[in-house]
């Protein structure tokens, strides 16, 4: 802006930008380039309004001006959308047909945020399995997201009993809506039924104290038009909630506990045979942190248990913002793969005393021994605004 600007010249420029926007709206274009031009015009319009308000003008033309902070925020939103659209335009999906509504601020801010979406469909949830106690959620046939390297990917929007999510090309599944928090508000039993695309997913929860990630019985609706491949995708893997991990169902929990008891029994018998051979001794430095199975629950003295648990693998728990942790995980996995044994996806605690999907995410990193963990901390810099805690697990 120059000092020569007057209210009349600003009004003319302001109205010119509005004319550009109206022409682009009436054009009803499916070309992404036109939508980039639209948001560029929006940015210029809001910059003019911001400047005029700062110059103590109350209106431009016949239009009253909002507070300067409102125009400033709208200008920032326009810049954000314009930059994202320009990046999308250069990707493999820039030549696809796009409507202006698919490139709107409302669509960009709708869950999952900062992703473009196409072809919305309704997912109806019956809380307490009551047809009169329902709430509609919106999922999308296609979701466009950027990875850690700002590359765009096109994936399917998926639905399961836990919520709405999409599966990244890395295999990680990201929930952008969980039903369990709403079930505690709008329901009493902790049960709900999910209905979408002529398909019904029934909860098999028998107690209100069950986890939100309990098992579900899926039944097709009256139509057979449901895409089976989508069912396979939504039922495969271990989805994480923006919230990156899914706790096991009751059935898998039973199998896990039974398997753990069998491992404990086998491990105890194996250690007992070693004891009979004179192997009942403290772990050597090389053995510390090397164990990958569970210490026996019974039959060990306190000293013997301490000796056995000394072999448990050491871990680090890193806590911080989810996207930062995911980017950091990708970087160190590419460069320092020899400094750790394995690493989890980003995950969050759930439960009445946690912040759920609004809280910080965590990464769990396991090591061969404490020396390797120390080497990792000394070599790999932690991302900003993160904390770490040390610990051991009795098995991996």
Curated annotation (Swiss-Prot):
It holds the Pfam family PPV_E2_N. Residues 1-208 are annotated as: Transactivation domain. Residues 206-292 are annotated as: Disordered. The keyword Repressor applies. Disulfide bonds: none annotated. Belongs to the papillomaviridae E2 protein family. This is Regulatory protein E2. It comes from Human papillomavirus type 50. The gene is E2.
